Design a protein with these regions (language model features):
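Extracellular cell-wall/glycan-interacting regions and their flexible linkers
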Residues: 1, 225-226
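Serine-esterase "nucleophile elbow" of acetyl-processing enzymes
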Residues: 1-44, 49, 67-71, 77
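Short, solvent-exposed loop/turn segments at secondary-structure boundaries
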Residues: 18, 51-53, 89-94
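Alpha-helical cap/lid subdomain in secreted, periplasmic
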Residues: 25, 58-224
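Acidic/histidine-rich helix-loop elements
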Residues: 40-60, 196
Length: 226
């Protein structure tokens, strides 16, 4: 029986490719007896509110038709925090951010009661201004602009982690894994692109490996108890 996995999020998820081939390859290598269908519903500039919308309603992204949860009935949902986009609201939006995630959790359980819900926080952004050629949206902005954006991204990612722990949900914390690697001497730039935000190929591998490890561990645990 095919295991359908759907990924929701912003451009951090969209960068995992459509379909997410690195994740698909890792899952197949780790679970050769299983068949997987992976759908990447990550869309750039998505806020948590739009994840909530897409769980309930059909959505078109270019030529990609994204079906609502009652139609999909996946085995697993990977729900990325969207912290970077919601962080534009700064202090005024923090309570709304966690309220929306409460609604996402409730909606996921309601519309896909048999699905496993996996919550994802990705690699932190860089506080430094990006390379000029990669800096299209904030061309020639001062370093204080990037420091401020990074500051609020950090706060929103941390708030998401706090929320996930408080709710007792399944959390894949790539941010923490990268911080541990940084402490051991590997710079964050090893995993992020020249824009200082999105994952480069090594980052895609890092995020995909963390998701695959979580899903494969659950498959193994389920097999041992049946």
């Amino acid at each position: 029986m095919t295991m359908r996995i759907v990924l929701y999020g912003d451009s951090m998820t969209e960068y995992l490719h459509t379909p997410p081939r690195v994740l698909a390859g890792l899952l197949q290598d780790q679970n050769p007896e299983k068949t997987f269908e992976l759908l990447n519903y990550g869309v750039g500039a998505t806020r948590a509110e739009l994840v909530l919308y897409r769980l309930r309603y059909e959505f078109w992204h270019g030529r990609q038709r994204m079906l609502p949860l009652p139609v999909l009935q996946p085995a697993a949902l990977v729900l990325e925090s969207c912290a970077f986009n919601n962080s534009n609201d700064q202090a005024a939006g923090l309570e709304n951010f966690t309220r929306i995630w409460d609604e996402i959790l409730e909606t996921g359980r309601e519309l896909a009661p048999h699905a496993r819900l996996i919550f994802l926080v990705t690699i932190a952004s860089s506080p430094q201004p990006p390379a000029e050629m990669a800096n299209r949206l904030f061309f020639h902005a001062g370093p204080e602009i990037f420091a401020n954006r990074h500051h609020w991204r950090e706060i929103y990612q941390e708030r998401f982690i706090e929320w996930a722990r408080r709710r007792g949900v399944d959390l894949v914390n790539v941010r923490q894994a990268v911080q541990s690697a940084e402490a051991a001497g590997t710079p964050r730039t090893h995993w992020i692109a020249a824009d200082g935000v999105h994952p480069n190929p090594a980052g895609v591998e890092k995020i995909s490996a963390a998701i695959a490890q979580n899903i494969s561990a659950h498959i193994l645990k389920k097999a041992e108890t049946t």
